Every structure is written in structure tokens, then in C-alpha cells.
Amino acid sequence: MERISGMSFDFYLFGLPIHAESISLSITDNSTVVQTRGIPDGWVSGDVAAEGEIELDAKNFSKLSAAAAAAGSYRSLPETDFTFFAQRGGIRDKVETFGNKIILTDVLNIDPKGGAKSMKKLKYFVTSPDFVRINGVSYLSDEDTRDLLG
């Protein structure tokens, strides 16, 4: 039976279908244990953040460039939501991130020997209290986002 692989994932950037060479998403959750007299005694919720990287070849980066030209600059690109989705062999995997702010990080990565496509790397960070959903389930609880979501 076919399984989900990196080739299985699709996503859109500003409404345009994009093929990424690589995509990452990392969540930082600073929840931690509390101690009484040096002994574990429960836990407290901490702050959260999520960020990732997307690596694009020149063909797919040109789609981002068109969106940046329409916005007036790369820094003026509006926040956007991402849905990374794959389905194979009866298994479905869907990760959504909300209010992503895109920053260009690696604009040139040239190997004079050739043999590989030229790549550009984007960093994105999640700015919305909707935060991240994994297979339809929010990472944050209703208590976490109280008074932040309409």
C-alpha cells in the first residue's frame, strides 16, 4: 500500500499552487513543570510560537515574486494561511498554520560546479491566535485563546 511521502504534499501560496523542495514547521511550547521544595508538583502552561522554512526553486519562487510585486515589496507581503495536505493509502495528513509572515532568508545559494537547481529559502512565523491545526485539531485549547478569537 502506498504511504504518504514528501512528494504527496500539496500547498498553495497566495492562491497559487506551489511545489516546495522542502518544508518544515516547528512548534515551541514553553509549558514546564513546577516544583515545591525541589520536588515536581504539577505544571504550568507557557508561551508558544511556531515557525518554519520553505525552500523553493526558481520556477516556484517566481510565483512568490509576482505576489511581492503586487504588494509593492517582499516585506509588504501580507500574512497568509498555509494548508499542507496529503492523502495516500487511506491515510490523510493535514497541517494548517495561520497568519504566516514570510521573510526571505537565503536569497542566493549558488554552486559553481552546477548539478543542482538554484534554491531560495523563506522563513515564516505564525502570527495568528488560530495558530496551528493538525488533522483538524487545534494545538491550542479554547482556554489558551480565550478573548483572542472572535
Curated annotation (Swiss-Prot):
Protein name according to UniProt: Putative tail tube protein
Pfam families, per the entry: Phage_HP1_Orf24
InterPro entries: Phage_HP1_Orf24 (IPR019708)
Organism, as annotated: Haemophilus phage HP1 (strain HP1c1) (Bacteriophage HP1)
Domain of life: Viruses
